[in-house]
Design a protein with these regions (language model features):
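Non-catalytic interface/targeting segments
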Residues: 1-60, 67, 86, 94-118
């Protein structure tokens, strides 16, 4: 088993994008042994011209990120968080370097405690 994580980052180093304004998501995969790697750079072209708070827009975002278990962004509103949650995706507002956040999330996941989130 592995987990896919969508990370909102403007610079590829820090988690610093607002979910509704994110231009791309860096997709990482965390393996059962705690190792992780970036597997994709997913563009948010589908967002162009859309309001980040529109319900249809949020549902599109959830569909595009459906293969991800978690979304790590600098900021996220309650509406976006709820739509992602309803689609089985845990959203977390995190302000840290990507590597640090992924290392901590990997430790959490391999401990088996992710089940408390569902």
């Amino acid at each position: 088993m592995s987990w896919r994580i969508a990370v909102g980052s403007a610079d590829g180093y820090a988690i610093n994008e607002h979910f509704g304004r994110c231009g791309r998501f860096l997709i990482y995969e965390i393996e059962q042994d705690g190792t992780y790697s970036q597997i994709e750079n997913r563009s948010c072209e589908w967002r162009r011209g859309q309001d980040g708070h529109d319900v249809n827009h949020l549902q599109t975002a959830a569909t595009v990120l459906a293969d991800c278990a978690f979304v790590l962004v600098g900021q996220i509103g309650p509406g976006a968080r709820a739509v992602l949650y309803d689609n089985g995706i845990q959203a977390m507002a995190v302000q840290s370097p990507i590597e640090l956040a992924l290392a901590r999330l990997a430790l959490f996941l391999i401990s088996g405690r992710e089940s408390i989130l569902h």
